[in-house]
């Protein structure tokens, strides 16, 4: 048609029929051709309409063909719009259902969720409600249900783990607010006022270009983070205050996202504290917090009192005349040595009272009763002599023989 210099109603009708046929075939490669032909018709038709012959039959066919093309185009446009709308609704509905039942995507399934469960959903809820991490009773029950279902579906590393209960989840949130540092920020930078904490968190999220939950009109004229910090502190904000807040905030977000298992500082300090002293049964284990991450101070163990019990030792110079308390002295082999006998002999010789003293009235008494009475009402246990039998006449003549006796004081 484009090569024919003569423009007529018949050629115009043929061009429309070609466009209709190619449009209904709906091939990817035909779309540029259809657009090109339509542009050529749009350019040539206004210049040649006045010169065309009036043929009512051909004009009627042109109107019918144009109407069919118009209906087909509108139908295709509506189908395309409906397809886009349905895709959007399906995606939105699927996302809503997945969020409601907390169905993880395939990329997340590849992770070992057993390390995160059962705290996975609780940490996620904590981040979503960071301005007020106090779940309602309905939210608690929903979190418990999602956690237990996810644990069963993914498969926990500990199959004997009992299902999560509401009171356990409540305790987890209490502990999480403390260990993450949220309570510390509430106390230090929000005057322990949860309303101030809510506005402070929203201001921080806004300054970090993070999404914040919708809130009613604020009573504070400014949403600047520095203004909130200065107002809560009750004094002008210093760079040290701002840095302290940023550090506490980063530590809190890190704990909520990753927990203690993936943070080196927490488990190192916990491990050191656990190894320093074995806790007694029934005593709680010391737990480190974000604000108190310092190694536990070593305590010097109480010194055991030294025993004042004297070590018993035997005297090397036993004497029967001795009045000292030697009840704890025991006999030793050294007492039967010659050095002991020499010392005992000199002691006997220097004592006039002992020169005429015979400890054994009868030589056989020592064999019959090894325990004899000595001066001072002391009992002396004498062992049998190693030498031969002593003759009574030698004692009567004042001769004191050399006796190697092992004497034990009882």
From Swiss-Prot:
Protein name per its UniProtKB record: Mating-type locus allele B5 protein
Polar residues: bias regions: 312-336
Region of interest: Disordered: 201-241, 275-336, 366-395
Residues annotated to bind DNA: 107-184
Subcellular location: Nucleus
Motif (Nuclear localization signal): 276-308
Any one Gene Ontology BP term: regulation of DNA-templated transcription
